[in-house]
Amino acid sequence: MEPQFPTDLDSYCKYFNISFFDLVLKCIFCKFSVSIVDLASFHNKRLSVIWRDNTPFACCTKCLRLTALYEKDNFFVCTAKSHLLTGLVKKELSDINIRCQHCYSFLDYLEKLYHLYNDVDFLLIRGTWRGVCRNCISHEGR
């Protein structure tokens, strides 16, 4: 069993006593160094550091988008009408964790309400509810 290392960037920086701005991690997929902007995005999305053979990895934005597309194409389970989701999972909309289907950011309450008021479906992909965040909506041209 591998030793327990930190899985979020804050804990990683504290554990190894390194400034976030000096952090250098490679992408788990393309193996290129993840830029500081992509690391900030990774942190903001509350994604986990991946450990392989005691080596930490993150994920760059380009690979994250490709991963999201791959998961949608290969692990799609179902769609749910946005007005029915709360009854389906028996939680308030504000309490349901929903990530963006394109970039993996967590949707805030206003983004969830956008789906509700615009009758945009939520998707269940690999056991996680997905929608579209405001940044990706603007790229979709809605």
UniProtKB/Swiss-Prot annotation:
List, alphabetically, the GO terms of the cellular component aspect: host cell cytoplasm; host cell nucleus
**Record's Gene3D superfamilies?**
E6 early regulatory protein (3.30.240.40)
Q: Which GO terms describe its biological process?
A: DNA-templated transcription; regulation of DNA-templated transcription; symbiont-mediated perturbation of host apoptosis; symbiont-mediated perturbation of host ubiquitin-like protein modification; symbiont-mediated suppression of host innate immune response; symbiont-mediated suppression of host type I interferon-mediated signaling pathway
Coiled coil regions, renumbered to chain: none
Q: Which InterPro entries match?
A: E6, E6_sf
- Ranges annotated as unnamed zinc finger: 27-63, 100-136
| GO MF terms, alphabetically ordered | DNA binding; zinc ion binding
Q: Which Pfam families match?
A: E6
Instruction: Give the quaternary structure.
Output: Forms homodimers. Interacts with ubiquitin-protein ligase UBE3A/E6-AP; this interaction stimulates UBE3A ubiquitin activity. Interacts with host BAK1.
Protein's job: Plays a major role in the induction and maintenance of cellular transformation. E6 associates with host UBE3A/E6-AP ubiquitin-protein ligase and modulates its activity. Protects host keratinocytes from apoptosis by mediating the degradation of host BAK1. May also inhibit host immune response.
What is the protein name for this chain?
A: Protein E6
What species was this sequence derived from? Human papillomavirus type 48
Q: Could you tell me the gene encoding this protein?
A: E6
